[in-house]
């Protein structure tokens, strides 16, 4: 299955990136939600600026769509420096990373998305760069090969990952600041939807923004995506005016239910309930039953279902909770 086919998939879609950039917050004062992260970053950034230092290297982790890239942009804006962006899979060779590092200005931010996917060769080059602001490069081949050191300007590496556990210990230990992004509260998502609606010039009331927020799975990227589809519906059917009834109609038509579930969420939960009698069921069996890759279940589908209390991950496998049974109007089996 292709994750991008899902309207509520938290992953980024290329066609949305330009539109999302236009409505992203640029500074911490505009940043909504994640209060602990925001307050800590305010202190760390202000302290670095007072000292005239580069900000310590920053690792941001959490489920997709929660604003890791947005936070990296905010850090660069607050520090008043350039942001250079790349990703783990793109940096195939040590020379790819070396080219980026040697082009940095003092205190610049280098943002590496999916940093857990760095190759070991590239990661080895990163260690002295992060720790000593030095680049070790091998010149020549065979017996004539020699290592030279290149001094780098002080810089900030921001790494983003959905799989912090996949990082090697040496890499993880070199980050001075580690921030975990959590799923957003509905009230914060409502503020995000309202802010995006204003930027898009939409006529939308508070009840409508709340309706979109409640179905956005705690994820700003999904909230903005649903908002754009609600806008389309309103423009065609309701002269562009978005109230709670219009938003609800649009989202129902898009097959996004009151919990923010789409057909894949319902398919997973119903597979556990119907095919495995509520579980426990192993991940491989569950992946085969719904025709998905186990990584997609672990990284994309499960986190929200577990966080919302519809699915349990146990040593024996996945289990549907009473809340999941009730969601589908099915009576859960009585415990012996």
UniProtKB/Swiss-Prot annotation:
Q: Which family does it belong to?
A: Belongs to the RuvB family.
GO terms for MF: ATP binding; ATP hydrolysis activity; four-way junction DNA binding; four-way junction helicase activity
**Quick one: which residues bind ATP?**
23-24, 65, 68-70, 131-133, 174, 184, 221
What EC number(s) does the entry state?
3.6.4.-
Q: Catalytic activity, per the record?
A: ATP + H2O = ADP + phosphate + H(+)
Signal peptide positions (record): none
| The protein's enzyme class | hydrolase
* Keyword terms, alphabetized: ATP-binding, Cytoplasm, DNA damage, DNA recombination, DNA repair, DNA-binding, Hydrolase, Nucleotide-binding
What's the entry's take on its domains? Answer: Has 3 domains, the large (RuvB-L) and small ATPase (RuvB-S) domains and the C-terminal head (RuvB-H) domain. The head domain binds DNA, while the ATPase domains jointly bind ATP, ADP or are empty depending on the state of the subunit in the translocation cycle. During a single DNA translocation step the structure of each domain remains the same, but their relative positions change.
User: Which source organism does the UniProt entry give?
Assistant: Cronobacter sakazakii (strain ATCC BAA-894) (Enterobacter sakazakii)
Q: What InterPro entries does the record point to?
A: AAA+_ATPase, AAA_lid_4, DNA_helicase_Holl-junc_RuvB, P-loop_NTPase, RuvB-like_N, RuvB_C, WH-like_DNA-bd_sf, WH_DNA-bd_sf
Listed GO CC annotations? cytoplasm; Holliday junction resolvase complex
User: What's the stated role of this polypeptide?
Assistant: The RuvA-RuvB-RuvC complex processes Holliday junction (HJ) DNA during genetic recombination and DNA repair, while the RuvA-RuvB complex plays an important role in the rescue of blocked DNA replication forks via replication fork reversal (RFR). RuvA specifically binds to HJ cruciform DNA, conferring on it an open structure. The RuvB hexamer acts as an ATP-dependent pump, pulling dsDNA into and through the RuvAB complex. RuvB forms 2 homohexamers on either side of HJ DNA bound by 1 or 2 RuvA tetramers; 4 subunits per hexamer contact DNA at a time.
Query: Where are the residues of the annotated region Large ATPase domain (RuvB-L)?
Result: 4-184
Region Small ATPAse domain (RuvB-S), as annotated, extends over 185-255
Protein's name according to its UniProt entry? Holliday junction branch migration complex subunit RuvB
What quaternary structure, including any partners, is listed in this protein's UniProt entry?
Homohexamer. Forms an RuvA(8)-RuvB(12)-Holliday junction (HJ) complex. HJ DNA is sandwiched between 2 RuvA tetramers; dsDNA enters through RuvA and exits via RuvB. An RuvB hexamer assembles on each DNA strand where it exits the tetramer. Each RuvB hexamer is contacted by two RuvA subunits (via domain III) on 2 adjacent RuvB subunits; this complex drives branch migration. In the full resolvosome a probable DNA-RuvA(4)-RuvB(12)-RuvC(2) complex forms which resolves the HJ.
| SUPFAM superfamilies the record matches | P-loop containing nucleoside triphosphate hydrolases, Winged helix' DNA-binding domain
Please tell me where Mg(2+) binds in this chain: 69
């Amino acid at each position: 299955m292709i994750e991008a086919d899902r309207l509520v998939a938290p992953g980024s879609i290329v066609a949305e990136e330009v539109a999302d950039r236009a409505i992203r917050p640029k500074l911490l004062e505009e940043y909504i939600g994640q209060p602990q992260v925001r307050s800590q970053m305010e202190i760390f950034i202000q302290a670095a600026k007072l000292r005239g230092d580069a900000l310590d290297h920053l690792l941001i982790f959490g489920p997709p769509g929660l604003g890791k890239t947005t936070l990296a942009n905010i850090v660069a804006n607050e520090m008043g420096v350039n942001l250079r962006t790349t990703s783990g899979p793109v940096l195939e060779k040590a020379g790819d990373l070396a080219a980026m590092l040697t082009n940095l200005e003092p205190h610049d931010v280098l943002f590496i998305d999916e940093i857990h996917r760095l190759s070991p060769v590239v990661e080895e080059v990163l260690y002295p760069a992060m720790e000593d602001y030095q680049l070790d490069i091998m010149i020549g081949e065979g017996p004539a090969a020699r290592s030279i050191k290149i001094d780098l300007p002080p810089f900030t590496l921001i790494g983003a990952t959905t799989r912090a556990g996949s990082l090697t210990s040496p890499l993880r230990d070199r980050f001075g600041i580690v921030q975990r992004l959590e799923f957003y509260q509905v009230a914060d998502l409502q503020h995000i939807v309202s802010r995006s609606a204003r930027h898009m010039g939409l006529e939308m009331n508070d009840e409508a923004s709340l309706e979109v927020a409640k179905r956005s799975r705690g994820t700003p990227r999904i909230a903005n995506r649903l908002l754009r589809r609600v806008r389309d519906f309103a423009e065609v059917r309701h002269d562009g005016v978005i109230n709670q009834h219009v938003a609800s109609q649009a989202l129902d038509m898009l097959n996004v239910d009151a919990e923010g579930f789409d057909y894949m969420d319902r398919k997973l939960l119903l597979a556990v309930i119907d095919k495995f009698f509520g579980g426990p069921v192993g991940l491989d069996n569950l992946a085969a039953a719904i025709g998905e890759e186990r990584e997609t279940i672990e990284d994309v589908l499960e986190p929200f279902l577990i966080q919302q209390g519809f699915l349990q991950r146990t040593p024996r496998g996945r289990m549907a909770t009473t809340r999941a049974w009730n969601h589908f109007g099915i009576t859960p089996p009585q415990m012996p």
